[in-house]
Amino acid sequence: IAALDTIIESEHGDDSSVFLITTSREVAEKAQAAIPSYWADMSPERAEYSRAVLSGMSGGIILVRDVAKAYAFINDYAPEHLQILSKEPERHVEHIRNASEILLGEDTPGSIANYMMGPNCVLPTSGAAKTRSPLGVMNFLKACSIGELNRLGLQEMASRTEIFATYEGFDGHANAVGPLRVQARGNE
């Protein structure tokens, strides 16, 4: 299963990136042995993409000492797709901060997620999951920020705002919260 699901991402193109991370030497060895046999059932072009990715610097199998090392790699790598193949995949989710899409268990291959399951396929790539989310409804909604201070709030914030504005060289900003504002109010 791990070998099949690793190939899903590696066949996209020779610029793809995919890693199988495991704490099990047996899983790593079985996947490494199985992957070439699956290439025989792919078009020559897709098999070559997969071969290039999995034998280059942007893909492969990583054997880690413990799951903490796996979490660290995942959160640093920030994958576009993360499939967790374990007996209890849900228990790992709380440790993942940076992944665009997380698929849980052996019955949730990326193929199904891409074509049928429903999660958005417009996902942050190349580590962008560290700071971005998948495309969603909020990307198409327009919002306005609204702020309002009362006189006391203005007085509380004015002097600090004036300091920041002066430091940044924005005299108009500083004047709008300083003595000129008080003077202008008196002329109203």
Residue ranges and their predicted role:
Residues 2-5, 23, 27-35, 66-69, ...:
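General structural feature for long, well-ordered alpha-helical segments within catalytic domains
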Residues 50-51, 71, 115-116:
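A short alpha-helix capping/helix-coil boundary motif
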Residues 75-188:
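C-terminal core of ALDH-fold dehydrogenases
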Residues 1-68:
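ALDH superfamily catalytic-core signature
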